[in-house]
Structures are given as structure tokens and as C-alpha cells.
């Protein structure tokens, strides 16, 4: 009972922080994504270390932060406070490009038994955590000339609706296992229940935002389907590392990757979908 109370309270606080940061301003949204990036990359590199890999944590984190800052600066309304935006962006991009070959140079002095593993897991952390969070910077402005945080809020609600309905339907009538090797409790019934919940939320979002209904129904399907795969991918990493949770930052919920795994994998797909459809 105590664990349920802790989980519920921390979940409510987390939801309030996430939604509040998105709605408050571009800068609070950017700060939220930056915190998730650092926490998520730290957890991923810890999981990689438990599997016998030796990622270059500092280099990876710096590259991830630079990638994020470049993308956030590109979409920020207040970019003028950073000076010459074009020059700053060019310098940042050049620095990021130099960090990639720097990984190979650093590996020369680490004397690791498996340098390819060290370099590979370092780059994986950037691709798995930093890239999706960087792309999220664009979601509130894709298809619009102005910043609209409610688009991001709607995307979050679609992911949450998918999780809730998948859990409820799976617990009630779930019989056919979806991916027992990685997640024994996931069922096909829960998967389709989650899709239905996500589509319903997508329809509601379209009505509230006065947007194209069919476009949002498609977005909901894309977000929900890839979100489930995101959960399975994180389960794959945790199972290989022999741990239940990626971290303990959020009481009763685990770490950043445990709570935002669906967003990490779905964000690139949602970004591309919105770019071409919305």
C-alpha cells in the first residue's frame, strides 16, 4: 500500500512538472528536455557498463548536450540573446563534428580490450537519448510559424493514453503474449487497447486544437505503435544489463528511461510524420 501511495504521488508530481514546463515557456521546456537528456544518457551508459562495455561517458554527454543546444537554439524565439545566431550555430556544429572523431582518438589512450564497443555504445547513447530529445524541440512548431506548446502536450497525452489503456485492457482480457522474451506481461489485447486509447486521445486533441482530425488520428497511431516498441527496446537493454529499472530518480517509477522510453523511440517517427503530413 505504501509503495502504491509513493508511486501515485510521485507520478502526479512528475506529470505536473512535465506539463508545467512544456506550457510555461520555451525555456522551461528546453530545461526539461536538457535534464531528461543528461539523466537519460547517464542511465544508458550505466546500463551499457553493466553489460561489459566501456562508453566514453563525458565525451558522449558533451556531444549530446551540444546536439541538443544546437537544435533548441535553432527554434528558440529568443535566440538573439545568444548573439549572431548563424555564427553560433556554425561554431557549435563544427564542435559537434570534431567530437565524433575525437572519440576514436580518446579510445587510443583508454587501452580498452574492445575499443569498438566503447565507441559504439558512446554513439548509441547519443542516438538513443540525445537525438530524440533534440527533435522534440521542433514538435511544438512543426506545421506552424509560431510556438504552440499544446501540440507537445497533446503528443504527451497520446503516449500516456496508450500506456493506460494498454495496461487496463491487458490486465482485464490479455491472453496472447506479445513479446514474452522481453516483456512477459505485454499482450496483443493490451497493444490494440492502447492503440484505441491513443486514437481516441488523438481525436480529442484534433478537436481541441481545431486541427485536421485525420492527420491527428494518424499521428496517434504512429506515436502509439512506436511507443510500444520504445518500451520493448528499453526492456531489452535492462534485461541484458540484469536490472529491473534503469535508475531510481523517480520514486516508485524508476529512472528517466523507465518513464520516457516510449517518447524516445516515437519522437523521430512523430517528427518525420508531422514534417510531411502536418
Can you name each region flagged by the protein language model?
Residues 1-222:
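Membrane-embedded alpha-helical bundles of polytopic integral membrane proteins
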Residues 266-267:
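C-terminal-most transmembrane helix of multi-pass membrane proteins
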